[in-house]
Amino acid sequence: MTSAVVDSGGTILELSSNGVENQEESEKVSEYPAVIVEPVPSARLEQGYAAQVLVYDDETYMMQDVAEEQEVETENVETVEASVHSSNAHCTDKTIEAAEALLHMESPTCLRDSRSPVEVFVPPCVSTPEFIHAAMRPDVITETVVEVSTEESEPMDTSPIPTSPDSHEPMKKKKVGRKPKTQQSPISNGSPELGIKKKPREGKGNTTYLWEFLLDLLQDKNTCPRYIKWTQREKGIFKLVDSKAVSKLWGKHKNKPDMNYETMGRALRYYYQRGILAKVEGQRLVYQFKDMPKNIVVIDDDKSETCNEDLAGTTDEKSLERVSLSAESLLKAASSVRSGKNSSPINCSRAEKGVARVVNITSPGHDASSRSPTTTASVSATAAPRTVRVAMQVPVVMTSLGQKISTVAVQSVNAGAPLITSTSPTTATSPKVVIQTIPTVMPASTENGDKITMQPAKIITIPATQLAQCQLQTKSNLTGSGSINIVGTPLAVRALTPVSIAHGTPVMRLSMPTQQASGQTPPRVISAVIKGPEVKSEAVAKKQEHDVKTLQLVEEKPADGNKTVTHVVVVSAPSAIALPVTMKTEGLVTCEK
């Protein structure tokens, strides 16, 4: 019998022989020798290895489906003993090679989805672009600031809460055979920043008692002070602001949907006898911790009520909060860019969304002095983009870098109405248009199927060196009909540029036609364009001549999981461009001064 001990690196080799090689060298056996791979008792094997070793009559050893055994390495350091029960002594070297091949094979779990067992496993982070993920739960959304971190934060461990000796007894007797619940409270979402993780008690499992659950709610910015709040934190006095909601959360945590405050109140009275809680006399729904716990997370009441003050303050990069989003808040956030004193810096350099964009089309043929000073979105082709820090009260979604923008065409509906009315011979030939893109509201869904509305907190646009140029031209196939074609190859969107919308800008919703025009490269055509608001006075007409108009283009793309891709087009319509189409206003941009 020959024994070979080889580590996973293949450097250590120990041989021992039982002295029967010379006696049985000339003898031939009909059975094939068996190669047995068994773990050494002292070694700790985390992955199982499997292979087939074939031994033919001519004493040639082969590994089935293994061509390059020596080139595949594993990261685990295990020791495996390969015992060969054979009568052929001269096959020892081949047996050791077979044992080494077994040690260098990939785990069956890694080879399950691959036909070739010798393919080197590439980690997902090598070929996958960088992603940012923000957990969303619509049931715990509050009005707070949004920040996203891509770093894995350490779990927050705190010292055990000092209680009386009787506090470790369970609140209720456990049922026989029922496992203790290991899930966290529903408001924590598994995030290390929301709630604190207690050190496990010896012999008590991971059961969360009611007083611990209330303490977690007091330390959660999603529930404090919305459902429960401190009245005197130094003395440990707190109040149940919404006792029904707290009892529902406790019932959801205990998997009891019929939980109410009356049932939970009986459990609270149990803590009176144990010396954990006390009822504050003369005040309803007010309780007090007998021994105030140490190292608790303090939630500021003003922090969750005023969002705008939060945006001006310095926040931690690893904090994650939920927000609610409405159409009015989106329009206010987009229009607050031009007033730098109202917007505070929030750096989201890795968040982008390419499927929903705002395209800004402006005609730089006019002089800069003739434009309104409020329309800072109108950027000429020679102007370099500036960095914009937008304080948008919206969550951040997951996306990748380097999104593309496609070709879009704006076509006038009336065939006889001219699209371009030239005011100068220079702009009549080929005026150029600058395109900018920013993300807009886009519907999405969570893991549990709840549909929510998300908004990226970064403005994306084209760099100054890669600005797409548009030609205001007349199609040859459409008689008397003008169109705006965004020509050129798709460009990657990576830079930042200031974008704002003027006061009183109408927001339009336009529908995409189901069938495109025939041709080799037919552009997408908007079925309608907008017209400036009705003129009330000469001063208003002069101001609105340079205002930025907004179009919203809805396009269905069922190829990507039936997602709706929304394009919002911001058009600057000076006197050089006439848009003679009636509009349907869905909302107006309001600017706070």
Curated annotation (Swiss-Prot):
GO terms for molecular function: DNA-binding transcription factor activity; DNA-binding transcription factor activity, RNA polymerase II-specific; sequence-specific DNA binding; sequence-specific double-stranded DNA binding. Residues 146-201 are annotated as: Disordered. PROSITE patterns: ETS_DOMAIN_1 (PS00345), ETS_DOMAIN_2 (PS00346), ETS_DOMAIN_3 (PS50061). SMART domains: ETS. It comes from the Eukaryota. There is a cross-link at K536 (Glycyl lysine isopeptide (Lys-Gly) (interchain with G-Cter in SUMO2)). This is ETS-related transcription factor Elf-2. Expressed in all fetal and adult tissues examined. Among fetal tissues, highest levels of expression detected in heart, lung, liver and kidney, and lower levels in brain. Among adult tissues, highest levels of expression detected in heart, placenta, lung, skeletal muscle, spleen, thymus, testis and ovary. Moderate expression in prostate, small intestine, kidney, liver and pancreas, and weak expression in colon, brain and peripheral blood lymphocytes. Signal peptide: none annotated. Isoform 1 transcriptionally activates the LYN and BLK promoters and acts synergistically with RUNX1 to transactivate the BLK promoter. Residues 208-290 bind DNA. It comes from Homo sapiens (Human). The modification Omega-N-methylarginine is found at R494. The modification Phosphoserine is found at S107, S185, S191, S363, S372, S430. Belongs to the ETS family. InterPro entries: Ets_dom, ETS_fam, TF_Elf_N, WH-like_DNA-bd_sf, WH_DNA-bd_sf. The keyword Amino-acid biosynthesis does not apply. Residues 171-181 have a biased composition (Basic residues). One of its GO terms (cellular component) is cytosol. The gene is ELF2.
